[in-house]
Amino acid sequence: MNIIFYHPFFNAEEWLAGLSQRLPQAQVRAWQPGDDRPADYALVWRPPHEMLANRGRLKGVFALGAGVDAILEQERAYPGTLPAGVPLLRLEDTGMAQQMQEYALSYVLRYFRRFDEYQLLQQQQEWRPLDPHQQDNFTIGILGAGVLGKSVAQKLTAFGFNVRCWSRSPKQIDGVQSFAGAEQRAAFLDGVQLLINLLPNTPETAGILNQQLFAHLAPGAYLINLARGAHLVEDDLLQALEQGQLAAATLDVFVTEPLPQAHPFWRHPRVTITPHIAAITLPQAAMDQIAANILALEAGQTPAGVVDVLLGY
């Protein structure tokens, strides 16, 4: 069994050693340009087109993250990047759900307790208590009800918040009001005071966080984008903040990463930036899951995390 690995930022030595330990029957190597030797499985993140092209004998392509949009974007730009008929698999949880819960809860509480406003008041040396928000009339909406969206919804519900979610198809989450489909999106947004985006990045969801959507939220709402930068129309966010339609935004993802130094988000007093760290891939847990899925494929079983390429997740 031959496995090729490519990630521009991960420690390749750590991954090769970890995978070899878990799959001693496998020959694991870091892919380099010009490497066209046989491979049964590919572990990738934003792979160059030539890495997977003409590898029709692959048994599986593993995305080294929860999202597969980078691979599918490559396929749209360079057809053949993803060999036809080869299953594409993504990581499911591997510690990401807990990280996402922690991140979302931290910033929900920051806005709910108005700590962001107190920080601005401190900079102005102004001592002024603010009226607190009340959970009874502080509705949180979550776009996306997959593994991460569901996990965040459950955490916030357990904290006593009124939570609703929206997804492409109906989902059932205990204690959470569910909306589905384009026909229910406006009803989902109505009255939401804090919106969290955890949608998959697909052509259908690109640019969904725009002025039209913001107008449906409660005046002075908050936005937390934890999915992909492509979901957000950045100029529309700046306009919504300027007009007071949105009170503040926390952004972990951006159209261009790293965020250019001249970007206005850096200096905006009501925009909080983190460098795409809301839920990072934990190597040991990820290797455990990938190894288990490879063994499942070798045994003719259905592995976890198989992606519907047409849907994009």
Swiss-Prot record:
GO terms for molecular function: glyoxylate reductase (NADPH) activity; hydroxypyruvate reductase (NADH) activity; hydroxypyruvate reductase (NADPH) activity; NAD binding. The lineage of its organism: Bacteria, Pseudomonadati, Pseudomonadota, Gammaproteobacteria, Enterobacterales. Keywords: Cytoplasm, NAD, NADP, Oxidoreductase. PANTHER family: 2-HACID_DH_C DOMAIN-CONTAINING PROTEIN (PTHR43333), D-ISOMER SPECIFIC 2-HYDROXYACID DEHYDROGENASE NAD-BINDING DOMAIN-CONTAINING PROTEIN (PTHR43333:SF1). Signal peptide: none annotated. GO terms for cellular component: cytoplasm. This is Glyoxylate/hydroxypyruvate reductase A. Its EC number is 1.1.1.79, 1.1.1.81. Belongs to the D-isomer specific 2-hydroxyacid dehydrogenase family. GhrA subfamily.
